[in-house]
């Protein structure tokens, strides 16, 4: 019986890595041998090696929409990355590549195309990111999360699959989460998720009104690397963490209300878990505007309350928390009516088909 092999790739932020992990249990169940290609120093290396998945590093350059002196040197890094990836693919001879986006994926997808290895990519956001845009001519299928995304995909390569959500995230234990946080008072729990890199503006707005928030809530604050505030370390009812992985399902189960960036993976997880949420998308000035589009789509569907980053201040945030609580049932009912499910099985079917399984 043939042993099938898949190489997964994706990196730069946790959002380009964790959806890969959602597919791993099912792939293993089907008998796939799994390897991973990422960058030398990206967050993906730490996340993937923890899962005991063999990891290859390649050179990768960032691709930018704006002028930067590195725009002259980074294409050479991408070229070296294609050569690195090509050597790995020649050695491993995978049946299929699964790419989750991020700049490290571009050399892998190009090398795979040159070697006639089928490539399945996934785009979480409403509009394709720059890496997926560049890589899409070399892909066989581009899976998307939002129905609106299909119009951006050329050559009929688009497939509406939804986003893959880790099964363990849907099976968190509330009491285990409470024990982990060691909250003394039995209040509601407010969780703040600033993304794997953190958000200075969200962190500051929350911390300014902490005393007010703590009257009603215990607070779990995922503030990003290097953003812990030592002066708040011993504050009752407030727990701050740079990044949480293993305990995240339990903390999500514990949360009654979530304030979050609007990365597609996170918002679809909040929808699947039916969590009341306030989205503060990364502004179009600081990004390509993908989070703004994601948040607008969720606001329109009645799943989320949205605050523009440009308008964010502590007073507005406090008012929004109170307004969300007042309208709790309206938002929860909209989420319950959603027909958007976990994309794992849809994506696995496409991977199997591409690998001729």
Curated annotation (Swiss-Prot):
Topology of this chain in the membrane: Peripheral membrane protein
Record EC number: 2.4.1.227
HAMAP family reported for this sequence: MurG
Similarity-based family: Belongs to the glycosyltransferase 28 family. MurG subfamily.
Source organism phylogeny: Bacteria, Bacillati, Bacillota, Clostridia, Eubacteriales
Name of the protein: UDP-N-acetylglucosamine--N-acetylmuramyl-(pentapeptide) pyrophosphoryl-undecaprenol N-acetylglucosamine transferase
Binding positions for UDP-N-acetyl-alpha-D-glucosamine per the UniProt entry: 13-15, 166, 196, 291
Role this protein plays: Cell wall formation. Catalyzes the transfer of a GlcNAc subunit on undecaprenyl-pyrophosphoryl-MurNAc-pentapeptide (lipid intermediate I) to form undecaprenyl-pyrophosphoryl-MurNAc-(pentapeptide)GlcNAc (lipid intermediate II).
Gene Ontology MF terms: UDP-N-acetyl-D-glucosamine:N-acetylmuramoyl-L-alanyl-D-glutamyl-meso-2,6-diaminopimelyl-D-alanyl-D-alanine-diphosphoundecaprenol 4-beta-N-acetylglucosaminlytransferase activity; undecaprenyldiphospho-muramoylpentapeptide beta-N-acetylglucosaminyltransferase activity
Transmembrane segments: none
GO CC terms: plasma membrane
Subcellular location: Cell membrane
GO biological process: carbohydrate metabolic process; cell division; cell wall organization; lipid glycosylation; peptidoglycan biosynthetic process; regulation of cell shape
Pathway: Cell wall biogenesis; peptidoglycan biosynthesis
Signal sequence range: none
Catalytic reactions of this protein: di-trans,octa-cis-undecaprenyl diphospho-N-acetyl-alpha-D-muramoyl-L-alanyl-D-glutamyl-meso-2,6-diaminopimeloyl-D-alanyl-D-alanine + UDP-N-acetyl-alpha-D-glucosamine = di-trans,octa-cis-undecaprenyl diphospho-[N-acetyl-alpha-D-glucosaminyl-(1->4)]-N-acetyl-alpha-D-muramoyl-L-alanyl-D-glutamyl-meso-2,6-diaminopimeloyl-D-alanyl-D-alanine + UDP + H(+)
Coiled-coil intervals: none
Top-level class of the enzyme under EC nomenclature: transferase
Key words of the record: Cell cycle, Cell division, Cell membrane, Cell shape, Cell wall biogenesis/degradation, Glycosyltransferase, Membrane, Peptidoglycan synthesis, Transferase
Pfam families (UniProt xref): Glyco_tran_28_C, Glyco_transf_28
């Amino acid at each position: 019986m043939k042993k099938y092999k898949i190489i997964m790739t994706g990196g730069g932020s946790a959002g380009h890595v964790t959806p890969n992990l959602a597919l791993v249990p099912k792939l293993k169940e089907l008998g796939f041998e799994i390897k991973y290609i990422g960058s030398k120093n990206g967050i993906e290396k730490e996340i993937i090696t923890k899962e005991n998945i063999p990891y290859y590093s390649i050179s990768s350059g960032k691709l930018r929409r704006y002028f930067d002196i590195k725009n002259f040197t980074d294409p050479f890094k991408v070229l070296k990355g294609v050569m690195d990836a090509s050597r790995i693919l020649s050695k491993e001879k995978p049946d299929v590549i699964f790419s989750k986006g991020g700049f490290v994926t571009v050399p892998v997808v190009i090398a795979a195309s040159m070697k006639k290895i089928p490539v399945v990519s996934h785009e979480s956001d409403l509009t394709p990111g720059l890496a997926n845009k560049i890589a899409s001519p070399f892909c066989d299928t581009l899976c998307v999360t939002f129905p609106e995304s299909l119009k951006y995909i050329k050559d009929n390569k688009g497939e509406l699959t939804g986003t893959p959500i880790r099964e363990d995230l849907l099976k968190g234990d509330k009491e285990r989460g409470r024990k982990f946080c060691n909250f003394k008072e039995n209040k509601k729990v407010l969780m703040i998720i600033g993304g794997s890199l953190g958000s200075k503006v969200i962190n500051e707005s929350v911390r300014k009104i902490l005393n007010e928030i703590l009257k009603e809530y215990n607070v779990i604050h995922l503030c990003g690397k290097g953003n812990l505030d030592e002066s708040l370390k011993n504050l009752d009812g407030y727990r701050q963490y740079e990044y949480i992985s293993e305990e995240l399902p339990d903390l999500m189960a514990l949360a009654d209300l979530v304030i979050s960036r609007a990365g597609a993976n996170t918002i679809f997880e909040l929808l699947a878990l039916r969590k009341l949420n306030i989205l503060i998308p990364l502004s179009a000035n600081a990004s390509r505007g993908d989070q703004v589009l994601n948040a607008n789509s969720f606001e329109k569907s009645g799943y989320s309350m949205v605050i523009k980053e440009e308008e964010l201040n502590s007073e507005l945030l406090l008012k929004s928390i109170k307004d969300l609580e007042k309208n709790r049932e309206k938002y929860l009912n909209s989420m319950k009516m959603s027909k958007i499910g976990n994309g794992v099985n849809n994506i696995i079917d496409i991977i199997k088909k591409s690998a001729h399984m």
